[in-house]
Amino acid sequence: MEAARPSGSWNGALCRLLLLTLAILIFASDACKNVTLHVPSKLDAEKLVGRVNLKECFTAANLIHSSDPDFQILEDGSVYTTNTILLSSEKRSFTILLSNTENQEKKKIFVFLEHQTKVLKKRHTKEKVLRRAKRRWAPIPCSMLENSLGPFPLFLQQVQSDTAQNYTIYYSIRGPGVDQEPRNLFYVERDTGNLYCTRPVDREQYESFEIIAFATTPDGYTPELPLPLIIKIEDENDNYPIFTEETYTFTIFENCRVGTTVGQVCATDKDEPDTMHTRLKYSIIGQVPPSPTLFSMHPTTGVITTTSSQLDRELIDKYQLKIKVQDMDGQYFGLQTTSTCIINIDDVNDHLPTFTRTSYVTSVEENTVDVEILRVTVEDKDLVNTANWRANYTILKGNENGNFKIVTDAKTNEGVLCVVKPLNYEEKQQMILQIGVVNEAPFSREASPRSAMSTATVTVNVEDQDEGPECNPPIQTVRMKENAEVGTTSNGYKAYDPETRSSSGIRYKKLTDPTGWVTIDENTGSIKVFRSLDREAETIKNGIYNITVLASDQGGRTCTGTLGIILQDVNDNSPFIPKKTVIICKPTMSSAEIVAVDPDEPIHGPPFDFSLESSTSEVQRMWRLKAINDTAARLSYQNDPPFGSYVVPITVRDRLGMSSVTSLDVTLCDCITENDCTHRVDPRIGGGGVQLGKWAILAILLGIALLFCILFTLVCGASGTSKQPKVIPDDLAQQNLIVSNTEAPGDDKVYSANGFTTQTVGASAQGVCGTVGSGIKNGGQETIEMVKGGHQTSESCRGAGHHHTLDSCRGGHTEVDNCRYTYSEWHSFTQPRLGEKVYLCNQDENHKHAQDYVLTYNYEGRGSVAGSVGCCSERQEEDGLEFLDNLEPKFRTLAEACMKR
């Protein structure tokens, strides 16, 4: 029993040891290492306390919880306060509970918060020797995710300087996001150097921030250089890719080959380039109509191509595609956008036009022209009103004579068959045409390897028509000898009836006959010579004389034709020398060439025979002729004749002996060329005649004309010195003063004794219209006496210094510009008595005239009949002058002024 007790005690101790070890293992397995965080005495709400490494303790935790409600734990281990906390000198702790809900595993982390009063360290004074130590003050990589959800302020990193071991360091920052826009985005804790962000940031607006961190002591000393700190904003896939257009429109030709490019679409993404966020993939997600699938899209470039060659515009002319672009390289979680793409199918000429009928029948009357006889239609499935649809017709067979043409109606696309050249029923009653049609645009070889032209047959029946005479051929000829006797007849123009092919019943009429040489028989069309025919006449061209003939039938239908009369030549013209003046330069030239012509035909012309007229021996002695060819000979002098002009008669005969004599004026001249000939007289010939050149004659004529001009000018100037006033007609003194200063010849008249002094001014001169006038001067007044037809009259013209009543009284010269003279028997009767009236006035004291002096009166206006007024008054006298006693009021004052008071 006693031995057993120690054994039992040992067993109990062993069990207690095992239980203690198990408890320690269990506790060790549930708890992780403790974490101590140094914090200030006061913690504001939602302030970052620190960060705990949760992964180190429990990597599979999916539930995080804090034992103290004043603290909140995030997934990354960040510890934030939920309320404002004041710490005492004692420690404060809480537990972070980590658990996995799947396997019910749990872990704990004990967190201790300690408040440690920071002792300000004094900066070393100069008396203390400083030892040089290596410092670390370099940029620390820093980044933050754009559009972060917080919680804010979001801790970014801690900025620390190694000098904090020796000094009390205060941290501060400046730059964009701090004191520059966007302001107050970042801040740093002065004591700890912790850098925080206060709100979310959009990378598309700010890709990064470069701020400057400063480390200073409380007294302002800066132991470190400013630290450039770059904060990069990490991109988040928060932007959708966007197509550059809402709707894309492309056009492609039908029947195109597989792989033909239709077009290219493009999209943009504002996220960070060269990342998965901007790696785009394109695709087609829908097509209208849905079948068949004819298009594909390259996923990277966005190029749309065809997958089939069966695009047919006549079936479907437009396709609509729904396209998509997605970022993240097209993965299912990428952002995507859709757009619309419209593809229009353009037409090509893949359908040939075909006639709706293969044969047509039509008819037309003969002799009709420029008429439409048939319209043909075609079918074409290509696009209307395009070159692929418009038809182009042509006549393939049956139009060898060019009677028809076919054109296209631009509005209906029909073929219009027309007659452009008249048809003849008597020649052909039916014509068969083959017509074909193609398009304006060439046929597409991609649609069909071969193309065939559509053809149709057109039968044209020619209908008979009662025609007029036919002038066929339109130009006919007859032959007649020139100089044929008047009345000679010949066959004329013949027209035919196309129905009977005969000329019976046709009447003929001459329309044109330039010289009236022939007449035409009305019934037969034969011609008769009316005047002698001359083949060499100017109206004849190439020996043919043309007349125009009109042929008509009984129905009045007509045709016209031309009859050419070929005139057969007879030898009726002698050869002659057209150039009748010859210059031979002596001694450089010893001869001259002379040429003869003959208007007749060559059969009656050359060779010509040239000879000197043998009537005078002097010609034979001085000249000789030598034939050069059939139409020319050489004339040369002999025996050294003197310079001068000679007449040399030459006889020219044609081959039939008809001849003529031409007298040549031959000049022997001392010259080198003919143009230099001055016609000098040979010194051996004395007293030769002198001849004037054309320029000398012209100079003499001009000199004579100049002398005549000078003489004419002198004559005109002499006649102009005599003052000849214009003649003003005396209109029978109707309410005007009668001209009373007439000095007519005759001894049996009583002259005025009023003391007028007269002086002859100039001799009489011939007037323009044949009136002779003579001028006298009366004091300061000029008087012109005009004599015509035995009657006499006179008018006065005031001199210089007074108003002129006549336009001709200028500068002392007068001109007669009017040929009208109003003279009558009344003047012949009254003029001799005017002198008596003046004489009686002087005898009467009560009616004595004023002293003789020139009276000046104001001009009453242009055109006044009484242009000048004399100084004499008259009283009543017999012989019809009683009207002077009863003057009208406007003349009384004038009469009183002329009387002596």
Curated annotation (Swiss-Prot):
Segments passing through the bilayer: 695-715
Glycosylated residues (UniProt): N34, N166, N392, N546, N629
Keywords for this protein: Calcium, Cardiomyopathy, Cell adhesion, Cell junction, Cell membrane, Cleavage on pair of basic residues, Disease variant, Glycoprotein, Membrane, Metal-binding, Phosphoprotein, Repeat, Signal, Transmembrane, Transmembrane helix
Tissue: Expressed at intercalated disks in the heart, where it is colocalized with CDH2 (at protein level). Expressed in intestinal mucosal cells (at protein level).
UniProt membrane topology term: Single-pass type I membrane protein
Effect of R132C: In ARVD11; uncertain significance
Propeptide feature ranges: 28-135
Stimuli inducing this protein: Induced in the hours following cyclic mechanical strain in keratinocytes.
Main location: membrane
Residue numbers carrying Phosphoserine: S864, S868, S873
Compartments in which it is found: Cell membrane; Cell junction, Desmosome
GO molecular function terms attached to this record: calcium ion binding; cell adhesive protein binding involved in bundle of His cell-Purkinje myocyte communication
Any one GO BP annotation for this protein: bundle of His cell-Purkinje myocyte adhesion involved in cell communication
Keyword Protease: no
Cytoplasmic topological intervals: 716-901
GO terms under cellular component: adherens junction; cornified envelope; cytoplasmic vesicle; desmosome; endoplasmic reticulum; extracellular exosome; intercalated disc; plasma membrane
Subunit text: Interacts with DSP, PKP2 and JUP. Interacts with DSG3; the interaction may limit the interaction of DSC3 with p38MAPK family members and therefore repress p38MAPK signaling activation.
Described function: A component of desmosome cell-cell junctions which are required for positive regulation of cellular adhesion. Promotes timely incorporation of DSG2 into desmosome intercellular junctions and promotes interaction of desmosome cell junctions with intermediate filament cytokeratin, via modulation of DSP phosphorylation. Plays an important role in desmosome-mediated maintenance of intestinal epithelial cell intercellular adhesion strength and barrier function.
Record's comment describing the protein's domains: Calcium may be bound by the cadherin-like repeats.
UniProt cross-references to PANTHER family, sorted A to Z: DESMOCOLLIN-2 (PTHR24025:SF0), DESMOGLEIN FAMILY MEMBER (PTHR24025)
The protein's name in its UniProt record: Desmocollin-2
Origin species: Homo sapiens
Record lineage: Eukaryota, Metazoa, Chordata, Craniata, Vertebrata
